[in-house]
């Protein structure tokens, strides 16, 4: 009888621990800031007609190095695109290289855009030398 009580006690403690861990993980993931992601998506929606506003939105993001990998790649792509559309010379390829490295050889619009702006950066670098 004592063995079954210990078993059920252990099972109850394990269940509570599992619930605690689940809630803790849920809390941690829900506390990540979505503000930057919303700004990225908003900047993307403005890019075609208002690239100057998109540039302002992108430059308002504090500490872009703290973004997730996906958001950092999108940030790099959009910031390069905004600079290009605002006729700001792309002096080096370090920013767009983040997007190129992330999107890699994926067959997507973002990968194509990253490679396009990477080429534009190389063109601007060749002209400036």
Regions found by a protein language model. Give the residues of each.
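N-terminal secretory signal peptides that target proteins for export/translocation
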Residues: 1-15
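A "functional boundary" signal
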Residues: 7-8, 31-129
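Bacterial N-terminal signal peptides
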Residues: 18-28
């Amino acid at each position: 009888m004592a063995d079954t009580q210990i078993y059920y006690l252990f099972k109850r403690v394990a269940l509570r621990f599992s619930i605690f861990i689940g809630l803790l993980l849920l809390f941690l993931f829900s506390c990540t800031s979505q503000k930057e992601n919303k700004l990225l998506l908003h900047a993307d929606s403005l890019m075609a007609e208002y690239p100057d506003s998109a540039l302002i939105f992108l430059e308002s993001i504090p500490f872009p190095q703290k973004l997730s990998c996906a958001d950092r790649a999108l940030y790099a792509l959009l910031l390069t695109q905004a600079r290009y559309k605002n006729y700001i010379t792309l002096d080096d390829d370090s920013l767009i290289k983040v997007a190129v490295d992330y999107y890699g050889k994926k067959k997507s619009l973002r990968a194509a855009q990253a490679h396009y702006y990477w080429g534009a950066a190389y063109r601007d670098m060749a002209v400036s030398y």
